[in-house]
Amino acid sequence: RTGGGAINSGPDLGDVGGDGIDAAVHEPADDRGTLDHAVSHPDRLGRLLSVEMTLTNGGSIPHSIDFHAARIAPDKAFRDAMPGESFTFRFQAGDPGVYMYHCGTKPVLAHIANGMYGAIVVSPAKPLPKADHEYVLVGSEWYMTTDGIKAPASLDMAKARAMAPDWVTFNGYANQYVTHPLSSKPGETVRFYVVAAGPTHNVNFHVVGTIFDRAWANSDLVSPPQRGVQTVVVPAGGGGVFDVKINDVGTYPIVSHAFAHVDLGQVALLKVGKPKGSMSH
């Protein structure tokens, strides 16, 4: 099974996987961008042995899907689906971690910049330490022909090639978790699964006011985690898993510590307990 849901309002990521259960993942693509659901929708595979993927292209141009979690010949599995075409491939999800998937059709820059990406979590056979809350944050940037507020807006390829975004976001919307903060209680462990979808910029992941108790850089859930880490670079196309346990009631900004990104919307708030103060980040 696969799971999760639109995460734009910041719900926890539930574990809907199980040992040895096959997954049938259906991702109809169209030219408007995204893959059959809201930008950055997370899928949780939880200790799967085999994944079956069916790509149906309902658009007017070729599309494909590239799973970073797969060990498979890309010329067979990640090939273009022509308009109206549907095909299926299978892969073994044997490497635990949080991975990006995205449209890999040329120009890849344009397809990712149009929102055709997401995150997939593969849980390890030996469970990670218990977390009270789990959140998926997918960083990306947007290059718009308008300010992105008034529709319609479309991709500005000149801006994309110049790496000059109008907005930088978590899960597709600038500042959404400032308006709708994530939450936990004092003493609870919060786990963040972070993917940098790019298409170009990294996420310099940092939580203001605390230090990561555990950090699995590069989404390596096989090796022991780093401990006592302040900021970890999640490269474009990469992932990372981060645990924090916060005892003090308060509001904790979650940022990419490249502060141009914060100014352009890549900031979230984690409210621990019922804080009364505010932050200026």
Task: Label each region the model flagged.
Residues 1, 14, 32, 38-281:
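Copper-binding active sites and cupredoxin-like electron-transfer domains
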Residues 2, 6-11, 15-17, 22-24, ...:
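Short linear motifs in low-complexity or flexible loops
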